[in-house]
């Protein structure tokens, strides 16, 4: 059964910051479902697709333990409340880039997430999230730095540069701000993952399936997070997948490594000889003299060269005296990594055969 099912069994919004979904994935071969569910669960928990506040500058606060006049919360409590804020970005948000937000409120007032002035590409998931409380005739001024950290996303190719004069001057001013308070960010939008195995006795050889439950903070739906996680795993293994193994035909499994190394060596030699084909043909016509055809049968082993010299020549598929003669020594020295000292030794050995490669 090659086709696998990926279906959503249940999905509900249990709160403004609690999105729950349950999925069915399978069926799989025996003992494979546990492996796949464990890998997928770990990838989901390592998600980093959220956009969060990473640094804050509070007017009147020198450090995180400072007390703000007229504000019920301390600087530390204020940072913890800002850390809990959930934001969502649209497809025009640039990833791995900093954005800036601003807050200025006068008391008496209860400050919520809706009071923050955000960039036009970032929105608050829950605008009623509590931040602080200000008493009479007091004010609270904040400058916040938001960072979007997303390495794998379906919309990463749709990041357009916004030509807004207001955003240009606003970001230019805020980038020069010294943010003294740093927040430990949590870029994950996945709150919880639970996986279990379902046994199906009515399917032959395919008797295990995965029941996957995912809770997010509503910045992304669980389905999108799962698809992004699967895509990131596929891209990871494709980047280290070697297609050269496909062309290897093995007659004996004991010679697997040896045959693979020979295949790589032949492929490198093919590219080099194809690339320098014109150069070698030109040098062959220019320097070719009367050449005894019987010399084409002479192996380079009969030249009495050093073991290292023979190794360099054979590595580039130069096996006979004719193969050595038709390649210019400048090409040998420059592109085949054969040293000048080795070339001198080869020329001395070729003198007795009545030909020298110039």
UniProtKB/Swiss-Prot annotation:
Name of the protein in its database record: DNA-directed RNA polymerase subunit alpha
Main localization category: plastid
The enzyme's E.C. designation: 2.7.7.6
GO MF entries: DNA binding; DNA-directed RNA polymerase activity; protein dimerization activity
Catalytic activity of the protein: RNA(n) + a ribonucleoside 5'-triphosphate = RNA(n+1) + diphosphate
Organism: Bigelowiella natans (Pedinomonas minutissima)
Oligomeric and partner information: Homodimer. The RNAP catalytic core consists of 2 alpha, 1 beta, 1 beta' and 1 omega subunit. When a sigma factor is associated with the core the holoenzyme is formed, which can initiate transcription.
Protein location: Plastid, Chloroplast
Pfam family, one: RNA_pol_L
Region span, Alpha N-terminal domain (alpha-NTD): 1-244
Keywords for this protein: Chloroplast, DNA-directed RNA polymerase, Nucleotidyltransferase, Plastid, Transcription, Transferase
Function: DNA-dependent RNA polymerase catalyzes the transcription of DNA into RNA using the four ribonucleoside triphosphates as substrates.
A biological-process GO annotation: DNA-templated transcription
UniProt-listed InterPro entries: DNA-dir_RNA_pol_insert, DNA-dir_RNA_pol_RpoA/D/Rpb3, RBP11-like, RNAP_asu_C, RNApol_insert_sf
Family, as annotated: Belongs to the RNA polymerase alpha chain family.
Entry's free-text remark on domains: The N-terminal domain is essential for RNAP assembly and basal transcription, whereas the C-terminal domain is involved in interaction with transcriptional regulators and with upstream promoter elements.
Region (Alpha C-terminal domain (alpha-CTD)): 287-358
Name of the top EC class for this enzyme: transferase
GO cellular component terms, A-Z: chloroplast; DNA-directed RNA polymerase complex; mitochondrion
């Amino acid at each position: 059964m090659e086709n696998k099912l990926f279906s959503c069994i249940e999905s509900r919004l249990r709160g403004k910051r609690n999105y729950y979904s349950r999925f069915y994935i399978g069926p799989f071969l025996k003992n494979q479902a546990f492996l796949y569910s464990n890998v997928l669960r770990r990838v989901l928990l390592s998600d980093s697709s959220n956009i969060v506040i990473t640094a804050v500058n509070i007017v009147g606060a020198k450090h995180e333990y400072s007390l703000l006049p007229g504000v019920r919360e301390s600087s530390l409590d204020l940072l913890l409340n800002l850390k809990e804020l959930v934001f969502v970005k649209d497809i025009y948000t640039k990833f791995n880039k900093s954005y800036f937000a601003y807050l200025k409120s006068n008391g008496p007032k209860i400050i919520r997430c809706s009071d923050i002035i955000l960039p036009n590409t970032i929105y608050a998931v829950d605008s009623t999230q509590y931040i602080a409380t200000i008493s009479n005739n007091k004010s609270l001024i904040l400058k916040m730095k938001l960072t979007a950290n997303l390495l794998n996303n379906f919309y990463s190719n749709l990041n357009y540069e916004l030509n807004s004069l207001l955003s240009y001057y606003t970001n230019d001013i805020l980038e020069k701000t010294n943010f003294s308070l740093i927040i430990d960010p949590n870029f994950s939008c996945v709150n919880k993952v639970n996986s279990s195995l379902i046994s199906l006795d009515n399917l032959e050889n395919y008797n295990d399936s995965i029941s996957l439950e995912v809770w997010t903070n509503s910045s992304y739906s669980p389905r999108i997070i799962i698809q992004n996680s699967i895509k990131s795993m596929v891209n990871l293994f494709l980047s280290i997948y070697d297609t050269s193994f496909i062309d290897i035909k093995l007659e004996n499994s004991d010679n697997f490594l040896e045959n693979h190394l020979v295949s790589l060596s032949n492929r490198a030699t093919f590219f080099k000889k194809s690339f320098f084909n014109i150069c070698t043909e030109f040098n062959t016509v220019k320097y070719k003299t009367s050449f005894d055809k019987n010399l084409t049968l002479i192996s380079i082993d009969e030249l009495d060269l050093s073991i290292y010299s023979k190794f360099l020549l054979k590595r580039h598929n130069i096996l006979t005296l004719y193969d050595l003669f038709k390649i210019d020594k400048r090409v040998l020295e420059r592109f085949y990594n054969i040293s000048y000292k080795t070339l001198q030794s080869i020329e001395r050995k070729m003198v007795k055969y009545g030909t020298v490669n110039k």
